[in-house]
């Protein structure tokens, strides 16, 4: 089977439908939570498509983080919620673990933005610079745009921003490879990596509500994995 983005989306939809069948066996409260999660996921995808409000009420970076929480954080948070709830954890611990999952989902997506620029196809399974070529405004791109709009931008910053937003030129493999290498080496990508680490640390704080046990250790390892893959 030749996998591509369309097949991956369809596979995800199939898994989600089968999860819905499982939720139906658990009771109405779980079905309701599952439906709300799916709603958040879809609305997050719509927000991603339409983009940040043009009235300046929300900064593009804050809006992007909101999209990550709705698209990915909601899904990982739901997985944590189901596990904690079905294990009959206290309401406080259920909330803490749900927040752990949501924050970790944001960290996962931010780390993916770094991998798109600094990894290889063999390691990540993605073509480096694929997001640039598609015109996807990832966090490094948004941070560079923010820098270019400030008085602190250098001519190099402005030139690079023009390069990575010239979608016609980026269809050329050589141009894309060079633009990807330049943006990957720019400080905004290191800033993005640091933000991924910060979101992992934020997620780990929620585990303070748990006593030390093998489950907590496994969750901690899972959280660290999100940034360890950047090394």
Where in the sequence are the language-model features?
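Non-transmembrane, amphipathic alpha-helical segments
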Residues: 60, 64-68, 92, 184, ...
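Mg2+-dependent prenyl diphosphate-binding active-site environment of isoprenoid biosynthetic enzymes
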Residues: 1-159, 224
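Alpha-solenoid HEAT/Armadillo repeat architecture
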Residues: 24, 146, 169, 208-209, ...
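Short, amphipathic C-terminal "tail helix"
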Residues: 199, 204-206, 210-231
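Short, charged, amphipathic alpha-helical segments
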Residues: 98, 177, 194, 217-221
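Mobile late-domain/C-terminal helix-loop "cap" segments
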Residues: 155-207
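Short, contiguous acidic/charged loop-to-helix segments that flank catalytic cores in large enzymes
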Residues: 127-131, 190, 210
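A short structural micro-motif
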Residues: 40-41, 103-104, 167-170, 185, ...
């Amino acid at each position: 089977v030749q996998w591509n983005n369309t097949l991956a989306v369809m596979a995800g939809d199939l898994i989600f439908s089968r999860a819905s069948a499982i939720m139906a066996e658990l009771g109405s409260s779980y079905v309701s939570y599952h439906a709300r999660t799916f709603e958040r996921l879809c609305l997050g995808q719509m927000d991603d498509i339409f983009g940040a409000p043009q009235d300046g009420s929300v900064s593009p970076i804050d809006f992007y983080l909101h999209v990550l929480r709705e698209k990915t954080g909601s899904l990982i948070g739901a997985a944590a919620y189901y596990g904690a709830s079905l294990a009959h954890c206290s309401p406080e611990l259920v909330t803490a673990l749900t927040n752990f999952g949501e924050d970790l989902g944001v960290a996962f997506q931010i780390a993916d933005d770094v991998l798109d620029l600094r990894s290889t196809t063999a390691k990540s399974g993605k073509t480096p610079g694929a997001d640039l070529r598609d015109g996807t405004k990832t966090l490094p791109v948004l941070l560079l745009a923010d820098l270019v709009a400030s008085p602190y931008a250098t001519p190099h910053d402005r030139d690079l921003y023009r390069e990575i937003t010239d979608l016609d030129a980026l269809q050329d493999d050589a141009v894309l490879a060079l633009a990807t290498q330049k943006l990957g080496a720019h400080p905004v990508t290191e800033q993005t990596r640091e933000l991924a680490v910060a979101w992992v640390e934020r997620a780990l704080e929620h585990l303070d509500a748990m006593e030390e046990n093998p489950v907590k250790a496994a969750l901690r390892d899972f959280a660290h994995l999100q940034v360890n893959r950047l090394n």
